[in-house]
Amino acid sequence: VLKENNIRCWGSVTLMLDDRNLVAKDEAQRAKSVQYTKDCITMVKELEGYEMTIVPGTVGKINPDGTPEEEWQWAVESLKECYEWGKKEGVVLAVEPINRFETYFCFYGAQALALAEAVGPDCGVCLDAFHLNIEEADPHETIRAAKGRLVDFHVADTNRFACGQGHWDWAKLVKTLKEIGYDGALTVEFVAPVDRTPANPYPDAIETDPVDISPEQKKFIEEHGSSLLTEEFYSWQVEECAKTLLPLI
């Protein structure tokens, strides 16, 4: 389908739900999570993609299982196994930090860079504009610090709507990416928040009769404060991202 529509797969991202956790105290749980990640890496290879973005811990888990030293060791060991699998499959790994309200383990850029460096010379990082806005004192310096290891960049505005609908200065952000020589994907990852009150400016945004959606996918979307969106609303959000970013790149 991708080839028929002249679309290239850039990569994918792990959905770290339920018991998926590369820094879990339980060894069997970590092993299961590593296998899931390796399966995702193989999927990217089969789609002829380039990179696999990995969130180390369970999304939504904000309480640690062990000491900082223990969890760092578990993370490095787990990711090293995934890293070696990625090298075998020809897929580059990217560690993604997500904000402190979604994880306790790796939530800002310097942590992701330190983890990538501990894993291997070709292990990269993925940064996300939405999370950068929450966690970084200077997001542009964080991007500059990732020079040479940045292999994916997720785009959504400060309110997690489409680019241009929050207060990110996209011209400045794209300029910073160009400064460090980044020429990879700008992966659209808006998660439009759903307003369930009478103040909702987009009352027709929610899809009331969804098809082809697994319970896991639905759970992931809803736990991010969003919902299943209508095709019209989703397409509009994608178009807004394109309208904002394409003139800048």
Task: Give residue spans per PLM region.
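Short secondary-structure transition/capping segments
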Residues: 1, 17, 22-24, 64-66, ...
